[in-house]
Each structure stands twice: as C-alpha cells, then as structure tokens.
C-alpha cells in the first residue's frame, strides 16, 4: 500500500481529477469536499501528506493547515485560485511546505508530492555515519532524536524548519545565500521560490527566541543569512 494522502477541495472536478491522478501513481488517497471533514478524518487516522485548497466553505485551507501543524509535522501543500503575494506568505506562515496556483498541471503536483515524501523518508533513514549531534551556543541538534534543543527545552520545529536549521548548524557562522539554503532543503528540482526561505527562517527565528536561546538568525541584506550568538556580558 502506498503513502496515504488526504485531499480537500470543494470543486468536485478538481478533487476527482487529482484523486485519480495520485491514486494511479500508487498513493492511497482520501478526498474531502471541505476542511472540516478532512480534520475529522485526520483525528481518527492521520495521513502522511495533506493537500488543501485555500478557499473552501466552512474551515478554510489556511485554518486547516494551522490546525494540522499544531499537532503534526507532515508535509502540507496548499492550492489557491489566486496568484496573490498575500496568499503565498499567509500559506507559508501557517506552516505549509509548498504551494500551487490554479490552474496547474497534475504532473507538477505529483512532482511536489514525490519530492516531499522522499525527503521525509530521507530524514527517517539517516545512517549511523551521519553526524549525530551539532552544537552552537545553547542550541543542540540531535539526529537520533530528530530535534533541536535549547538547553533541555525542545524547539518546536516542523520537519522543513528542522532541516533548514540543522543544515545551518553544520557551519553556524558561515554566511548562507538564499539560493544555497533553498537548494539544500527543497532541492534543485523544486519550484518553490526564494521567498519561502525568508518566511521559513522568520518562523525559526521566532521559535528559537521563544525558547530563550542566545542564538539568533541574522539577516545579511541582499545576500542571505547566518547564525549569530549573542555576546556574553
């Protein structure tokens, strides 16, 4: 049985097309006409990936994404009929991993689904040869626990945020360009735009600060980012 995918879209024709396309590639798909039905099903049996239309009656896709992200780090792809900067930023800020504007080719969605699930498998299948622990300041990344800690407190990161922060912790004082981070975390074949790096790092910066860390994500204007530890007084 293939990976389980939940799909919510109030447009029946789109829902049936995507359901058929994903199922033909070997995925186990359940489709829903609204976000509330998907949430109810997820509470009973979580899926491995979720695809959400933003504009739906009842609980919209952004609210569903926010609810799912509060309890799970599974990959989430948002669909929207509007090519809007605000929709894009809102979607990423709610914790989605990727974004597609309608109309789109089903093959593009399939490519994104494969890439996200492949990265989940890679995260789970880290070898013993990999670096088990990385430290910078009061932050510690544990490959065994697949988590970042500030002291003894776990920093509540999604899998995408975890991949990005752990990548930067390998060389914490290096200046990383947006393009390098984008390629390292989302891959060279990704159609995700560079601004998703900015939004993901904004969330990481906020979560690290909330955990009480002395480490911050510093912006290098016109280039990218680096980690910086506050000077001790």
Language-model-detected regions and their locations in the chain:
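Short, Lys/Arg-enriched segments at the junction into DNA-binding effector domains
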Residues: 4, 115-175, 179, 228
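Acidic, metal-coordinating helix/loop segments flanking the phosphotransfer/catalytic sites
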Residues: 31-49
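His-Asp phosphorelay/catalytic-motif detector in bacterial-type signaling
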Residues: 46-48, 71-75, 191
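The short loop immediately C-terminal to the conserved phospho-acceptor aspartate in CheY-like receiver
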Residues: 54-55, 82
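Positively charged, aromatic-enriched patches within helix-turn-helix-type DNA-binding elements
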Residues: 147, 152-215, 221-223
